[in-house]
Every structure is written in C-alpha cells, then in structure tokens.
Amino acid sequence: MSTKNALNDSQIKLLNSLNDNKGIPSTEFVEKFAESLYETQNDGSKKLSSIDGSIKSFAACLHELNRLKSRVGDRIRDYASASKQVQNEYHQKSNHLREKFAQVLELSRHLEDNVNDMRSGLVDAGQELERAENNRKRILSSAELLRYYLEFRSGKPQTLMDFFRTNNHDKMLLCAQRTRQLLALANEVDLPDSSETLARIEKFSEFLETNFLKFFNNEYRKPNWKGMASFGTILQEFNGGASVVREFVNQHEFFIAADKVQSRQGLEQDPIWLILPDPTQKIPPLIQTLSSLFSELCSVIEGDCAVIKRVFPNPELVLQTFFQRIFGQSIQNRLEEVMEIAKGKSNLAYLRTLQTVVSSLRKLVADLKTILENRGFSVSDNSPLSLALNQYMEDLLVPFIEVDDYLKREEHSLRSLFRLSLYKYTSYKIRLETPEPGLLRSLMTPLQGNMVAPTGVHSQFNTKTEGFLLRIADIQENLIQSGSFITEDYITIEKNHSHLNSEKVYSFIGWHAEALNRASILISSQDLSVVISSLVNLLDKLIREDYVFKELSSIQSYISSHDKSKNLDLHYLVDIRECKKIMGYFSAYLMSIVIPFTGVTASSRRETVNILSSSISVIECAVNDVFYATVHALGDHLEIILSPYRQISYAMTEEQIDSSTELRQSMTRNVQNYLDYIKNLYHRLGPYDPSLLALKQKTATMLAAMLISFAFRSKVTAAGALLLQNDINFFHSTLTSWGIDTVDAKFKLILQLLSLLMVKIDVLPAVMQDKRKAGFSEMNIHEVLRLRFDLPENLKLQLNKEEALLPPKSS
C-alpha cells in the first residue's frame, strides 16, 4: 500500500511544495501538516480526530521526507560531478591559453629586438651618411676656401666680391660665412707673403662689415623690418651680431633726440627742491625730470619690443645692450645732475632725493619687466633679462650709496635737526630771555648745504626760503608769515622755553623713523643691521644724554645750590613731567618700531633692548635723585620756618597760655602759607599727573613727619595738651587738602590718643586699657604717653623697658 494513501490532499500538496524547492520553516511545516489531523468541537476547541490515523500520517510523511532527502542527495552529487567536470575543462583551456600567450609574448620580444636592431642600424647608417655628407661639404668648402685664399693671394678676390654684389640674401650670407672662415684660415697659414694675404682678407672683412651695417641702417631708416632682419642675420653669421646691435642701439632716436637735453637752470627751478629739504613735508613719490624720462623709456621699449623680436636672431642680447646704454648713459647723466643739485641743498635733501630715486628706479625695473613679459620675453628671477636689469640698476646706484658716506650724512642731518628744534631751549640756557646772537644762523647753516649765509650779530633770515627752518626752531608764526627779512632781535624767548619739551622729541622720533625706513630702502641687507644700530645709538645719545639727562643734572645742581632760607622754586617739576613723556615716547618707539623692524638681527635686537634698559635705568635714577633732593630741600626750608617757634613749650600752666598766643598765630600763619605754596605748585602743574603723584606723596609724608616731630618736641601738661591738640588739628587740616590717605590716617590716630595727655593720673591706666581695646598698639600709645609732664615713675620704667624691646624707628 502506498504511503500517500495515509495522507490527505493538503498534506500531499505540502510535501510537493518541498519537492519544488520552496523554502518552508520546519515549525510552519509541522503546523500546516498537523492542521488536518484535528477536529473542531462545538465549544470551538480542537481535538485530535484519530491517534492511529495521525501516526500513520506522520509515518507516511517521514517516509516521503526520506525519499525526498534521497532524491535531493542524488541531485547534489550530480551537480557536484558536473561542476568538477566544468572546472577541469576550464583549467585545461586556461593552461592552453596561457601557453599561447607566452608564445605570443616571446614572439613580441623577438620582434622588438629585431626592430631595435634595425633602428640602431638605421641610426648608425644615418650618422655615417651625415658624417660622410659633412666630410663632403668640408672637402668642398675647404676646396672653395683654398680657391678663395689663392684669389686673395693674387690680389683679385673676384668670387666673394661677386657674391656680395648680387644683392641676393643667400649669396651675401654665403659671402659673409666664407669670409669669416677664410679669415680664420688665413690666421693659421704660415707661407711666404701670407701676412699680405691676411691683410687683404682683413681689409675685405672691414669692407663687408661697413657695407652690411650701412645696408642695415638704410633699411632701418625706411623702415623695412624684413630688410633689417636679412642684414641682421648676415651680420649675426659674420661677427656674432655685435656690430649690428651697436648700430641699432647707437642710432636709436631715443639717444639722439634733441629734446632729451634739459637745462641745469630749469632743473634747479623745480618746486621739489622746496619740499625735499623740509622734514615736516612728506617725501615726494617722484622727481619730475626722472619720471618723464622713465615714462618715455617705457613707451619706447613697449613699441620696439616687437621690432627687435622680428629683426634680430637674438633679441634678448639686443635688449640687454639697449638697457645697458639707457642705464649707463641716459639715466646716469640725468641722475648725476639731480644728485649734484641735491648735494648743494642739504644732507637731508640729498638723502630724500636718493630715497625717491631708488624707489622710482625699482618701479621702472618692475614696469620694464611687465612690458617684456607681455611681449613674450622671459623675465623670471633667473632669466638673463631680469638679472641684467637688476645689475644695471645696482651699478647705477653704486657711486651714490656708500655705507659710511650714507651714515655720515644721516647722522649729521638728524643731529642738526635736533639741535635746531632746541634753539630756544639752548638760547635760554645761555642768555635767559634774550636770544644769543648768531646762534640761530649757526644751527640753520648745517641744514642749508652750500648756501652762503651771513654771520655774526647782523644775521638776517629770509622767511620765504628759510621759513621751514624757522618753524623747526619754533620762531613765531606771525614773523614767518610776514614774508620779510627778520633778525634775531624780532625773536622772543620766554621762561617756558627753558623746560624739556616732549613734543619736540616726538617730532624728532618721527624724523628718526623716516631715516630708519630710508635705510631699509637704500642699504643692503648685509649692512642694514650696522646702520640701524648706529642710528639707534645716535637717538639715545641725543635724547637721553644731550637733552634729558643734562637737564636733570642741571636741576640737581640748582637744588643743591639753593638758599634754604628762601622758598624752593619748583618750576622744574614741568621737566619731570616732560621727562616721563619723553621716555615713554622713546621706549614705545624702540619696542614697537625698531626692535620688530625688518632686517634687524638678533644681536641688534639685544643691543637695542640693552640701550632701552640702560636709558630707563639712568633716567629713573636721575629723577629719583631729583625727588629725593626736592623733598629734603622742602623739609630744610620748613625746618627754618619752624625753628623760631621751638621755644614754645606745652609744659605750661593755664596762666601761661595767653602769653604764647601771638607767637603761635605767627607760626601757624607761616606754616599755612608755606604748605599752601607747595600744594598750589603741585596743583598748577597737574593734580592728577602720575609723574608728580609720587613726589607729592613723598613730600606730604615728610612734611607730616616734621610737623608731628615739631609738635612732640617737649613735655606736655594738661593745660598744654589743649594747645598741642589745637596745633595738631591745624597741621591736620592744612595737609588734609593734599589728599594723601596715609598722612590723614596718621593725624587721626594721634588726635584719638591725645586724651592720654589730658586725663588725670589716677584714671590713666583705665584710659590706656580702653585704647588697647579700641585697637591701638602699645607703640602708638607710648609714643603719646611719654609726653606727659607728670608721668609716674612706674610707667616711665615700663616705657623704658618696652622701648628697649622695640626696634629703632626709621626716619
């Protein structure tokens, strides 16, 4: 009986789906297979219809699954066998194709070797043929040269002369080539009469060169570019083209035009000579006479580049020769005239002119390179044209830029400008408010070049031509604007001109910065560091040594020689304030401009930092010395004011108080006037000026200490304590307006402790204890307590013991 009889249709269909290779999960297969084995009950539940039937169905299913498994296994084995057979066939075909490709590759190698052998053979054959042809030509040429030589030996060079007369380019070119070769041959021949033959050949060569140049020049005048190119090529073959290049350059209308010549008088009348010597005006970007020449030159090059490139076989050589002539003649002649005029004006005019010239030349070279590049010439950094232009410019400037001469001029100019700007300061130091005769002219002359100036007390100044120098010297503007001649009698010098002036230094630093920038333009990188170092040292010497430090030393001398019985004139505090500003400008300039400056080496930077550090240290030390001397001088005068009143004693009875009233009023009035005088001076010079605040604090502290010491000069009775309190209150009120917190605190502390002098002896210990609880130190308590006239012996002994344990007070 077939197992399928135990299966229903749905189960058979399910098994057939497996046979059709439909993938069904095992769990789903079992559920679908078992669905037909259950019956649905009335309550909706399912119940196995028959156990035997179910067993038979599962047995039949298992049998079918085994049969299906066997069939699938047979198929797998069939597929594996077929796959193995296909793989074997593939390997066989692959090996066969590999062998064929190897054979083809070997044949290709043999073929390539054969081709290379053939190529090598052909090349060798070609070279042999070329050598044979060259030998044939040399033989023919040698034969021709011998024939030509014999013609010259006989004195009748008919063949070459016929070539020359044909007016045919190829024949003329052949004539030039053969003549050049013949000349070389004749120099090596050593036969009888060979010198005469050589002379005839040389004469013929000169004849050819002269006529070819004439023909070239005729074509140039037409102009006929094709004819110029023809004769240019002939001359290139004849002598390398040197003569034709010279002919072209020398005959160029740029060099022979009459309008290129400018009169010396017209050049000297250029308004630029009113600007260049004046440091207060900006440096002009160009000099008109050079600018017009450079513009015309650029136009000529832009127009002739195409002609030169079309006519000459080696246009770069022609351009180099052209530029050499331009820089070495046209520009040099014009530049020498300009610099000669500048030299006669002043060192500053010369240096500024040179700076403008160098900037203009660099722009010219850059413009020429741009023109050449646009015309198809190579102007890279290492190209012949670029190197030639740079070299011509450097050679042109060599006579004008020599490091020692430049530095000498720059230092002389800066030194002269600085001294002229301090004219009124210097004059006041010599003759107070009366100008020193001849001083202004002596300071102006170094800035006027070769100008012949009147000397002596009758010097006159032209406000039109010398106005800028008078402004530098700080002469009144109304005199300069008058446009007339003035003498030193017109000049007013006031007391305020005797002080340091930070604005003068600020202007001078600007001139120094211009010199620094000029050095970076004119001086090579190898020498720039040395030049900058020299200029910085000059700046330090002029500002610190010759100006600031000298003035501080003068102030110190004034204070030390001052009569202590008279009020100290603090006019010099203006110089302290200006000194601080000057050193601020100096420091900022070195740190922000000089040290980061391009071209400064590490050693130069260290040197600059050392200069700055040394300058600040020296000036600060000098300022502190002035402060110290000022404070002591003010204290000395206060001591003189207080000395007549030291006879006033606070150890007095109530009956004696009235007798001291008039004397005490005189003391307070004199002290009040003196302290107000000092305070008003500080206030007038600047109540919030940081450069004077430290001095004001030191002065107030010193004065307070002296007044307190004066108040504590004697023993105090209970009645005298009231007078002492009044005096301390007066001193406090006088110094309170100074706004010094430490001084104010000191007086308040003393006033709070004065009750120790007023209470009776029996309550003194209790009052002392209260002061301790209030936070007053034992030292402060004892400082006041020791003034009591009636201090008990036990407290005196205690004070002496404690005083021995305390460190000595510093002044």
Swiss-Prot record:
Residues 106-147 form a coiled coil. The keyword Electron transport does not apply. One of its GO terms (cellular component) is exocyst. It comes from the Eukaryota. One of its GO terms (biological process) is intracellular protein transport. The keyword Transport applies. Keywords: Coiled coil, Exocytosis, Protein transport, Transport. Belongs to the SEC10 family. PANTHER family: EXOCYST COMPLEX COMPONENT 5, SEC10. The exocyst complex is composed of sec3, sec5, sec6, sec8, sec10, sec15, exo70 and exo84. Interacts with dil1. Component of the exocyst complex involved in the docking of exocytic vesicles with fusion sites on the plasma membrane. This is Exocyst complex component sec10. It comes from Schizosaccharomyces pombe (strain 972 / ATCC 24843).
